[in-house]
A protein has these predicted regions:
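Conserved AMP-binding/adenylation subdomain of ANL enzymes
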Residues: 240-259, 267-331
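Conserved ATP-binding/catalytic segment of the ANL
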Residues: 415-475, 601-603
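Conserved structural elements of the adenylate-forming
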Residues: 77-83, 196-202, 213, 232-253
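Conserved pre-ATP/AMP-binding loop-to-beta segment of ANL
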Residues: 52-55, 174-175, 180, 187-221, ...
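Conserved ATP-dependent adenylate/AMP-binding module captured primarily in the ANL superfamily
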Residues: 129-167, 183-186, 199-201, 242-261, ...
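Conserved AMP-binding A3 loop
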Residues: 69-74, 208-210, 217-244
Length: 608
């Protein structure tokens, strides 16, 4: 019998289920969404009045060894009101925006809440758009799309090249030291100190009271993995309802009113959710300077030892790195599992072997397992709107949280996922006519994702991700390949031998994969990969059978958009960038560095 989970405090996940004659399934939580306020600046003001001295955000300034710098709820409210007052003085037209170039910081949050209070939509973007150099194509695209009247770059010296070489039109720049910049296109460059010194009065109060639930408050960019990013319109209603359903379902177990640690970028909805979810729960968020990548993860590990949070969130690659560290470091194991009650993963599926490995470590350390959950959602749904909040040992995408209605439309052996609820976007900025493609005839948002049941006879056991419909491709013989689902299966089969992989084979005779190995691929390692894949291939058809494996040495490139801010791989971009590696998989006869699986007599045989 498996050890118990640490105590959780989840509400009922009972669903009302309707099955139509055409196979379509409609699922709605029986539990209604709790009442909530559709005005985040008012939420901030209320928290500041209730506990003005409590830490809201904390950051390290000057590197991982620097002390934490704390910002209380009272300080955040005062600072954001000053910024709002300054914005209101600029008398900006309603079709403009505020563009945030900087990453996660206390000042970033104040600027964002200040823009909300002044009813000027804010658009936080990946720092890579401004820092990676080149022709700044994505940054220029965003500028043309959101038409910023104000640009915020916290440290002008860090963004100097972009600020001097990109045309920002007639925008005003807010930065720490305008004097470090040479010639720019900005109409005016203003110091941050001057902005936050602005006196806030009744004008700010009136602006906050005038906020309506359905006006644009944020423009959040899509990942842009297959095209230039779109700007998703996010409203106060979207954000508030999404935050409310998360608190209702996960908040008590996760301890969002306590200390939180998170690195996820605020230019992405998951990171932005954590920042605002902490606010609406009255908690304290410590901004993690670490990242789940070699050379950057040690800071996260040190922070975990210090803070020992109840809740931890990361991408699957981060959990793989954490499991490695936990196995090496007894002190980390003791401190990490001491208070942990809930672990959340996102960005990709969590391989079952990694889940089992993590639970083994938890049981060895504290005698109980840790409940894992995940959120399913998109930029268009504010953030995660489905979650695992019911007893299960299976990974997946869970069930709808209160307030969301799920529509499952049959698609071969899977279901297309469609969603409806107050957390769904009204559309994209400057994309008239797009709504007809975004929504079906009943008003459900078409996610483009597919799912299957963990148990076809029992919806209550939840759903699991079955790939992006847009990631499907055909082999040369016309056989369809569900690449997203296949990738998740392979990650599970090959964990922990590999970090990630690319599925190859579009218009080819057979499937191959390119993998990022977890160690140098010596003969023993190659043999282990071959044995795993030979077992994996047993009983599988051409749409899932892997014939060859290539080993990648260059890590996924952030600058080339191969990896998103949240750490997931953009398969299409990576395959295009590594076309030479893909072609090498199909050279005849097979080249020596490519591993052949399952008796392909055109290359190296599997040694068993």
């Amino acid at each position: 019998m498996s050890p118990d989970f640490k105590e959780t405090f989840f509400p009922s996940a009972q669903m009302r289920e309707v099955r139509r004659a055409d196979g379509t399934i409609i699922a709605t939580p029986e539990l209604p969404l709790v009442d909530h306020l559709c005005n985040i600046p008012l939420e901030l003001a209320a928290r500041a009045a209730t506990h003005p001295e409590k830490t809201y955000l904390a950051e390290r300034r000057g590197g991982p060894a620097a002390p934490w710098h704390h910002c209380s709820y009272g300080e955040m409210n005062a600072r954001s009101r000053a910024i709002a007052a300054w914005i209101l003085e600029q008398r900006i037209q309603s079709d403009r925006s505020l563009l945030i170039l900087s990453g996660n910081s206390i000042l970033h949050a104040a600027v964002k809440y200040g823009a909300m209070s002044a009813r000027l939509p804010a658009c936080p973007i990946s720092v890579n758009y401004s820092l990676m150099g080149g022709d700044y194509g994505r940054l220029k695209h965003v500028i043309a799309l959101v038409r910023p009247a104000i640009v915020f770059a916290e440290h002008g010296s860090a963004f100097k090249a972009a600020l001097e070489n990109v045309n920002f039109g007639d925008a005003v720049l807010i930065t720490d030291d305008p004097g470090v910049l040479g010639r720019t296109s900005f109409r005016q460059c203003v110091s941050t100190a001057d902005v936050v010194a602005t006196a806030a009065g009744e004008g700010v109060d009136a602006s906050i009271r005038a906020i309506t639930p359905d006006e644009p408050t944020l423009y959040m960019l899509t990942s842009g993995s297959t095209s230039l990013p779109k700007a998703v319109i996010q409203t106060q209603r979207m954000l508030a309802s999404n935050l409310a359903q998360g608190r209702q379902v996960l908040g008590a177990t996760a301890g969002w009113g306590d200390r939180m640690l998170d690195w996820l970028p605020w230019s992405h909805v998951s990171g932005a959710y954590t920042k605002m979810g902490t606010l609406t729960s009255g908690g304290s968020l410590f901004i993690d300077g670490g990242r789940p990548m070699p050379g950057r993860f040690d800071e996260t590990l040190a922070n975990l030892k210090e803070l020992t949070p109840k809740f931890f969130v990361n991408v699957p690659s981060g959990y793989a790195m954490l499991a490695d560290a936990l196995e090496r470091d007894a002190e980390l194991r003791t401190k990490f599992f001491a208070n942990l009650r809930l672990a959340l993963y996102g960005g990709a599926g969590l391989p079952q072997p990694l889940y089992d490995r993590f639970q083994r470590l938890a049981v060895e350390t504290v005698g109980k397992r840790i409940f894992f959950t995940t959120g399913y959602g998109a930029t268009e749904t504010a953030s995660g709107c489905m979650a695992i909040y019911f007893p299960t040992e299976e990974v997946g995408i869970g069930l709808p949280m209160p307030g969301l209605t799920l529509k499952l439309v049959p698609n071969a052996d899977r279901y297309e996922v469609r969603l409806k609820g107050p957390m769904i976007t009204p559309g994209y900025l400057h994309a008239e006519g797009e709504a007809e493609r975004m929504f079906d005839e009943e008003g459900y948002y078409r996610t483009g994702d597919a799912a299957v049941f963990n148990d076809p006879q029992d919806l209550g056991r939840g759903l699991k991700f079955a790939g992006r419909l847009s990631e499907e491709f055909k082999l040369g013989n016309g056989t369809w390949v569900t690449a997203g689902r296949l990738r998740d299966l392979l990650l599970g089969a090959l964990s922990p031998l590999i970090r990630d992989l690319l599925v190859c084979g579009e218009n080819r005779e057979w499937l191959s994969i390119l993998v990022w190995p977890s160690q140098a691929p010596n003969d023993d390692f190659r043999r282990a990969i071959a044995e795993r894949l030979t077992t994996f291939n047993e009983g599988r058809g051409a749409s899932e059978r892997i014939r060859r494996v290539g080993f990648l040495t260059e890590p996924p490139s952030v600058d080339a958009h191969e990896v998103s801010d949240k750490g997931s791989i953009n398969q299409r971009v990576a395959l295009q960038r590594r076309a030479t590696d893909v072609a090498r998989l199909y050279i005849e006869p097979c080249v020596a560095e490519v591993l052949t699986i399952d008796g392909d007599d055109r290359g190296e045989k599997n040694e068993r």
